[in-house]
Amino acid sequence: NEYLAIRDAKQMGPVFHYLGMTVGIGVSENPAKKLKVAQKQRIYQSDIVYTTHSALGFDYLEENLATSKSKKFLPKFYFCLVDEVDAALLDSAQMPLIISGSPRVQSNLFVTCDEFVKTLKEGEDFNLDSTRTSVWLTRKGVKEAEIYFRVQNVYDPNNHQLIRQINLALRANHLFEKDRKYTVENGEVKLMDEATGRLLEGNKLQSGLHQALEARERVKISLETRSMASITYQNLFKMFPKLAGMTGTGRVCKDEFREVYGLGVVVVPTRKPNQRIDYPDEIYLTIPQKLYASLEYIKALHSKGQPVLIATGSVGMSEIYSMLLLREGIAHNVLNAHNAAKEAEMIAQAGRRCAVTVATSMAGRGTDIILEKGVAELGGLAVVGTERMASERVDLQLRGRAGRQGAPGLSKFFVSLEDDLITKSGSKWINDYYQREIAKPEEKQKTRLTSFRIKYEVEEAQKNSDNSGAASRRSTEQYDESIRIQRQIIYSKRNKIIAHPDFTLDYFLSVLSDAMDDYTKKNPFKEQADLYRFVLDNISYYCEDIPASLDVTDLQQVKKFLSSLIITEYQKKKDRIQDPEMFDQFQRIVVLRAVDDCWVEQVDYLQQFQSLVISQGYAQKNPVFEFHKEAFESYK
């Protein structure tokens, strides 16, 4: 984050200055003020630049919207060193950085489709896949939609917008869990980082999904914007010939680092022996049983003065634990997405005697909890996990809050078969076992589950979840490959236009000839009104009447007429501007704007198409192949 980039640059800057190197800070020290181009040019000329992954990504996108050399500031990428590298390269890998442009025409179907989707029943009208990452209408659901919206065929091309909105409403209602994937603050839907529980300020879901979530929550629906430029963190960091990083949890994902980024993982031994005790999980049948057992354990630790960090998987669960602790009269702090501003202050107090801190997994990374004098003798910090997280790395980060720098500490996780991890990623066996047990009278139910098979199934559920996350990241990489190649070509062409503008009248006439050939293949002129419309849209708003003798079906005649029109308009502009240097600049900006407009259309179309084509996997088609095929055709 910005705070750490600024802190580290100021701490290490004097060392690098002493060694004869310059240091720049790529983020603004005043959040209210954005860095200007001149400032960025000075910063990026430094030998070493401290910045954040989002600041670097947006700088890259902004530079590639520049219209002159004077507005460019980035050097050629060479070496990048990433702190908390698994968070940046894996957890954030699928998150696209997007510069939004003008809003698209807003659909009035968001609320209507949300109301329709809320009437549907799972298993009858729609189905979810086993990992609850895809949702689709059944035949009965399709029939319900046709009755509800009074259409004969919901998949008719004329109903494209309707089926798109229904699919968005399905995803918003059934794939996005409130207080885990997003939350509502001050009448706004705000996204959350599932791995850390932190709010992703300024981030929005694309392709209408954010507006569908707003419709679900009945808050004001924001404008759906078009993407002017976008890039994923995966592709941003892959542009560096040399890439490295550090993290406390790299070993468990070493295979993915090698497959995706070609990076090996080296384990560095700890400076001091690890004294933390990691106790086995306690597994229970239901969430209430788990809550009671974990609360008793926390009370026992608190009674002897040992500081406790309670790690929850969602904002909702952190608030439940807070309520239970209040009922027991235990003073505590709550750290979640709703009060992240107080994070540093709360973490600073978490190592004090008798301190109890309830936190989402946001407390698991980049925060040192300093033990108060005398706390080490009590056993150090105790980390109590209230569920196994979706990734083993998050569990390890949470355990790692205790036992820092050779200090004592302990960690223990409490799990139930009703936890999200088990219900979404657990095997059929463990879910069947739960159904059998829960069907028994309460007095005959097993409460604490100690069998080796149950423990094994919990571990397997987490492995399944990790594998699902890795597969999802690989899928994102596959889809993004076409956009990556096209982006490189477009940005390379832009740079050539900026560096060597060499435009002549002949160049524009050749562009016209190619454009005419492409246009008339799809939209042959049938009458003079068609040609007149083409002129108004593409050449000039000031067009005299088209000669009555002109045969608009004869392409050569039309080209001759339009060429003369372009020569006239070109000369008018040249006479008006007069200064040759200014005229060159005018031509460059015209061409860049034309390239940018086409690229915006392409990026926006591919994002819309990607969300649509994924559903073709259920139509016996390979969605990735279909996407690449269409991406190539639309680019041509």
Where are these regions (language model features)?
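Extended, charged helical/alpha-beta scaffold domains that provide interaction surfaces
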Residues: 183, 187-190, 198-203, 405-406, ...
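Conserved P-loop NTPase motor core
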Residues: 2-442, 491-492, 509
